[in-house]
């Protein structure tokens, strides 16, 4: 179906067909969806990126899927469709229901993913046993939404399902507000970035497996979250 391989921008939202390959996200949507484009660059090999899709990641619902953290951080909405009952939309945070399970009904398919075009910097980090063609030991995405003074997060491969870290989001956004940093765009204090990382790690529910221990996953998440928040904030300051 040709429409599944198309994308469009309308009123500040990107409608990404479920069959758009990662390679096109990298080439065409790096400005509108920077976090997802970063994640797409880490997927498999060039051959896999030419064929693999966000729709495929959503359908398999693996907690280690690279697309999930940036979808969560950006506030994506999944558009699904049934021939008998029509279309409906599911927020990404409600889409993952268990290990490799999702909210799709038996007669539904994934039609598209709707994401707001980035209003601020986004970052994606991933730890694996090597630098390429690797399943994530843990992954993290961060999105700054300066237009509404909010922070988005996404955690991968460190819980039964991909998940956000709502307490960490509220903490960082609130501290930035209290310190006047949303307005001043001053330097992000290292202590604040570290406290954010600790809250992200606390939101995870990792296990020990052949790829890494639960303790390592928590530690790596705290480090990635601290770094991602700092990188994103520095990007925001440069754009001011």
List each model region and its residues.
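C-terminal structural segment of proteins
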Residues: 1-240
């Amino acid at each position: 179906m040709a429409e599944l391989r198309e994308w469009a921008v309308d009123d500040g939202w990107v409608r990404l067909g479920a069959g758009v390959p990662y390679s096109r996200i990298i080439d065409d949507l790096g400005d509108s969806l920077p976090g997802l484009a970063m994640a797409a660059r880490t997927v498999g090999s060039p051959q896999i990126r030419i064929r693999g899709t966000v729709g495929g990641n959503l359908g398999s619902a693996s907690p280690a899927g690279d697309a999930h953290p940036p979808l969560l951080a950006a506030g994506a909405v999944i558009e699904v469709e049934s021939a008998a009952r029509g279309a409906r939309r599911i927020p990404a945070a409600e889409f993952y229901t268990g290990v490799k399970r999702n909210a799709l009904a038996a007669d539904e398919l994934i039609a598209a993913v709707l994401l707001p075009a980035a209003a601020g910097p986004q970052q994606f980090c991933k730890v694996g046993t090597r630098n390429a063609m690797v399943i994530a030991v843990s992954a993290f995405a961060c999105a700054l939404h300066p237009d509404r003074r909010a922070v988005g997060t996404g955690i991968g491969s460190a819980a039964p399902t991909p998940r956000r870290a709502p307490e960490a989001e509220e903490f960082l956004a609130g501290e930035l507000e209290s310190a006047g940093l949303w307005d001043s765009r001053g330097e992000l204090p290292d202590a604040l970035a570290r406290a954010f990382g600790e809250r992200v790690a606390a939101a995870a529910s990792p296990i020990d497996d052949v790829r890494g221990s639960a303790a390592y996953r928590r530690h790596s998440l705290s480090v990635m979250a601290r770094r991602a928040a700092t990188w994103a904030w520095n990007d925001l300051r440069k754009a001011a």
